[in-house]
């Protein structure tokens, strides 16, 4: 984010300010980080960030590893017939690149992205995901690492799980209303599959 701001002559935002916006679409992050700037300046920052991101992808210098235990969890969920979906603040192109890199593109029945729906915590992405797969709120769980994920789930009327190994800590996720806090993939698996959670 700092490089994108610098590329258009703006002072870089504080790291804690950037962290507080993670989970939101990029344009919304920039608007929150630079509220007094003209829309044209914010648009240039968004473009600079995306260019840098896709350059890092092209040259394979971005590191987005799966968290420990997540691949096995996805296998276990699929084996039980759980329908998987994604609702993310990323744009579709960025999400697909990430999923392709990990061989996960075909594992999700629905993929909702920030370039096709209102920003979290608006429930539109989650509502569209449920509609696409024929799910109901009572049979849906929103799992996320940001308070915006939890708030979106609450706004859609679904149960929510905060994973504490990502962007927000346990206290922040609990304050947002998470129904369960998972400290690791094993705890998440146990809660979802009913194997002791």
Give a label for each model feature.
Residues 63-65, 85, 91-143, 147-156, ...:
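Substrate-recognition "cap/lid" segment bordering the active-site pocket of phosphatases
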Residues 4-5, 25-40, 98, 129-130:
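Helix-loop "lid/cap" segments that line or gate small-molecule binding pockets
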Residues 33-71, 80:
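Metal-dependent phosphoesterase signature
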Residues 1-20, 34:
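Active-site neighborhood of HAD-like aspartate-dependent phosphohydrolases
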Residues 18, 42-46, 95:
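Short amphipathic alpha-helix in the helical subdomain of ABC transporter nucleotide-binding domains
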Residues 1, 70-100:
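Substrate-recognition element of Asp-dependent hydrolases with the DxDx(T/V) motif
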Residues 180-184:
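Short acidic-hydrophobic, aromatic-tinged amphipathic segments that line or gate anion-handling sites
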